[in-house]
């Protein structure tokens, strides 16, 4: 069951909502707000995942140098041997 909540919007957001309804993208202000909240929730979820990945990377310690030329040499050698 939904919860009735009221809030005050400034002219900018009020006009934006009215424009979305007039354009036929939404049927009501409630639909616009629900859509905006879904987007905000998705963004927060993505940011949380990014923060967790960054923290995991920091905990994994210092990186080691990568020898790209050596890597390519090994791959080419493997390819020539049919691996």
Curated annotation (Swiss-Prot):
Residues 54-83 are annotated as: Disordered. The gene is parD1. Belongs to the ParD antitoxin family. Keywords: Coiled coil, Toxin-antitoxin system. It comes from Mycobacterium tuberculosis (strain ATCC 25618 / H37Rv). The keyword Cell membrane does not apply. GO terms for biological process: detoxification; regulation of DNA-templated transcription. The keyword Coiled coil applies. Residues 33-60 form a coiled coil. Antitoxin component of a type II toxin-antitoxin (TA) system. Upon expression in E.coli neutralizes the effect of cognate toxin ParE1. It holds the Pfam family ParD_antitoxin. InterPro entries: ParD, ParD_sf, Ribbon_hlx_hlx. GO terms for molecular function: toxin sequestering activity. This is Antitoxin ParD1.
């Amino acid at each position: 069951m939904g919860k009735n909540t009221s809030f005050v919007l400034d002219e900018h957001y009020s006009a934006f909502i009215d424009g979305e309804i007039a354009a036929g993208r939404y049927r009501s202000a409630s639909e616009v707000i629900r859509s905006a909240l879904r987007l905000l929730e998705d963004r927060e979820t993505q940011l949380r995942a990014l923060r967790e990945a960054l923290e995991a990377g920091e905990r994994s310690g210092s990186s080691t140098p990568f020898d790209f030329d050596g890597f390519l040499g090994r791959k080419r050698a493997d390819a020539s041997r049919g691996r």
